[in-house]
């Protein structure tokens, strides 16, 4: 088969913290005022990306990988992750603060969720003046401090935050 750039139908997700910038900046076909995410490539169960055009139109990414594993994933990825696409590509519009999330490592994710862990990489395409990225808890945080701050509704004080601006990259 002659391969071509595969594009997928975006999977749009409403979030309480979302907005309309996915339409403004990326011309996404959103109708909600709270669209927070556009999943571009996903193998998350119940949200599997479907090819948008070409000879593979209508096939989902898992079907394409089953037909052409090495061509799509490459030998190194197959050796490490099997015939599964190990990434989730998405655009985010965070009009409001996102929820605090804990992402398990690969071992815990496999044990409890039958999936891979979640390491995040961010590239900032646009940022409002006060925009910031939360990169975890401050180094001196501990369980007792967390529980205390949680009770007082001050958990945000324990977070390590960095200002962001357009074209910034964080991993």
Q: Which stretches of residues belong to each language-model region?
A:
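Transition-metal
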Residues: 1-141
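Short, structured beta-strand/loop micro-motifs enriched in basic residues and often containing a Trp
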Residues: 148-156
